[in-house]
Amino acid sequence: RSKSWNVFLFLYLALPLFAQKEYKIDQVSVVNVGDGRLLFQELKTEKALNGEHRIIDGYHSAYVLASFKDGFYDGGYKEYVDNILITEGSYKEGRKDGLFKINSKFDGKLKEEKSYKEGKLDGTSKSYFTTGKVESERNFRMGKEHGKQLSYESDGTLRKEHNYKDGKQVGKQYTFLKGTYDLYETVYFNEEGFQDGEYSSVFTFGSPRILGSYKNGKKNGRWTTFAESGDTLMIETYLDGKEDGLHVSFANGSGVRQKEYYMKNDRKDGLYREYNLENGELRYEATYQAGRLHGKERRLIVSNRFDYWETSTYVNGRQNGPFEARYVKNDQLRECGEYKNGHRVGRWKRYTIDGKLEKEWDEN
């Protein structure tokens, strides 16, 4: 009787092994039925797979151990590479359903966890560092990000905290940015998923790097950029996402005004000036209209003899009209003539600093 019992027990334990059938990958046809599901059939008979089967990809030392129903994944699912379990989860009627675990193909350590419902991400998904600490955490509701999105440094320091609702960013978004400067960035999103409200990026020691604001996803109002020292580097003005108004930039370290001009619809419009970085004195001045030079342009020319100002006339971006150059020292005329479509034309004259005619010629 004992011998009969042992035989029965052996057959009972061995049943799953006999029930499980192995297929090589080229013995199975896989059809995408169009709704994200895969239909598995025996290649020769075209019969849908049912029960637990092992599908082997001998070329890559990989295989899948999964349960099937009417040709679709249904039940437990495991994927191996070089006998290391790299994916484990479950399906329901061909769709991922429940917790999926993704492991490293090198050492089998847990890399990711994802929760599914009816084939869509639903619940908390996590990724892990090789140490086992959480690297990131995201929350979903039926395929759309919903809730907090968190990411961490390997030492556990929070790097990102974003908030989502039905797939859109909403509310306060915090990010730790690493680059030339390490910065803490904070921006706000409205219920429609657009940036809206105050924006700031701040140095790790607490001083601001950039301060500004958004309105319905577009930059709006004054934006200011600062140096690590706290000095202002740039002031910009925006309207509906386009630069519109005064733009001023300053030299880092000295704080000397470098450039100032006006913008309209992202194009220079109005007075434009540049300054000497050493002493802050004006060295260039022009007028723009709709992004093109239009009107007078003055440019300081520094010479090893005598510095002088050149004054040109522009019409719709082309140099047209009278030209003159005057010495800085005594405002005496240095050179005069005329331009037409960017070329010198007509009679030109040049004078010495004491007012004597030095040269006179014609330009073709």
Predicted stretch roles:
Residues R1-Y23:
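Bacterial Sec-dependent N-terminal signal peptides
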